[in-house]
Design a protein with these regions (language model features):
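Short alpha-helical "recognition helix" segments of helix-turn-helix
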Residues: 24-25
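DNA major-groove recognition helix of helix-turn-helix
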Residues: 39, 65-68
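A short, Lys/Arg-rich alpha-helix, primarily the initiator
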Residues: 1-19
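Recognition helix of helix-turn-helix/homeodomain-like DNA-binding domains
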Residues: 29-44
Length: 70
């Protein structure tokens, strides 16, 4: 899995959530600018923040990461 694939899945999940970046940021405890950086893959969230992000977006972390087999 390449970063561009993670980026695509993250962007799709955010779009499908119907939430604004500002609201996502508020719910996971970061700034809207930080969420924007996640979407551009400038930075990747810390594990605990990534877990919160997945909960807020109602998406499985293995989907975002492209993990198909364990």
């Amino acid at each position: 899995m390449e970063l561009k694939d993670i980026q695509m899945r993250l962007r799709e999940s955010i779009a499908e959530s119907g939430l604004q970046q500002k609201e996502i940021a508020r719910r996971i405890g970061v700034s809207a600018q930080t969420v924007s950086k996640y979407m551009k893959m400038d930075i990747f969230p810390a594990l605990d923040t990534f877990a919160k992000l997945c909960v807020v977006l109602d998406v499985r972390s293995d989907y975002i990461l492209g993990i198909e087999k364990y």
